[in-house]
């Protein structure tokens, strides 16, 4: 059984494809994980801008083959986890499919929750009866959803968002990437720990 992740931003050319590829690269060794991305207002068929490609390359990621696509309800329905680049995208996802509420987080929000709840992961995985890496990852998302309301919010809600660098300066691309990268790795680490806990 595959654990599927959908990464969402606006155009599906800067933030969500880079998050998709970072997560896919980090999680590939730990289970059958399928990561995809889409945009709420996608520049369909467009590639990743050169600035974002260069930043991704630093992490060993080749983003040249990516082509933007528009999100649809089926993609949301099929995903075990939806990570969005900003609160607006999360809202649009949940409006499109209210049942996705428990599976939809902004990337930085989920990273913050993961930080606060990861000590409870082994118990959550055991309570869920998870015996495969993919079931462990599902248990991790269940835990994050259940405890979302108990995690102290950031000083400003903007800290849940990753800045959109499209058509902006190289500095903005760099800032966007610096917001995205640690959050993606934190989420990957959280899911990896859950996968390992289930496989023990």
Residue ranges and their predicted role:
Residues 1-79, 87-102, 189-199:
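Conserved active-site segments centered on acidic
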Residues 94-200:
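Phosphate-binding/catalytic loops
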